[in-house]
A protein has these predicted regions:
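Conserved, structured core segments of small domains
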Residues: 1-110
Length: 110
């Protein structure tokens, strides 16, 4: 089955202004995805790693991409196709609590 990488963006304000019952249903969707084999995690502090021309590693604290909302979490999910992946993540906490979820097809290298 195809795999998809999801990146959830959201913040505390959006989470708190969402009704508790909607948040609970969204957390239940996370549980369903875990039962289906998804790897789900909350984002920690990001670092940027560079090694131009393999001549030396440089590490910078903080994310490379700047967005209106912080990255809240990541998941790798199984879905039949992109439409199925979208349907699944449309019910997770970041999507429901005024955030956004990006869905990226995972193209496995051979």
């Amino acid at each position: 089955m195809p795999k998809f990488i999801t990146i959830g963006y959201g913040d505390k304000d959006g989470y708190e202004r969402t009704e508790k019952s909607a948040r609970d249903r969204a957390h239940d969707q996370d549980k369903t995805l875990r039962r289906e084999g998804a790897l789900i995690g909350i984002a920690g502090a990001a670092v940027q790693v560079r090694n131009p021309d393999a001549a030396g590693v440089a590490v910078t604290n903080g994310p490379y991409t700047v967005s209106k909302l912080p990255v809240a979490g990541f998941a790798i999910i199984d879905a039949v196709d992109l439409a199925d992946a979208i349907a699944k993540v449309s019910r997770v906490p970041c999507a429901v609590t005024h955030g956004v979820v990006e869905v990226w097809p995972l193209i496995e290298a051979v």
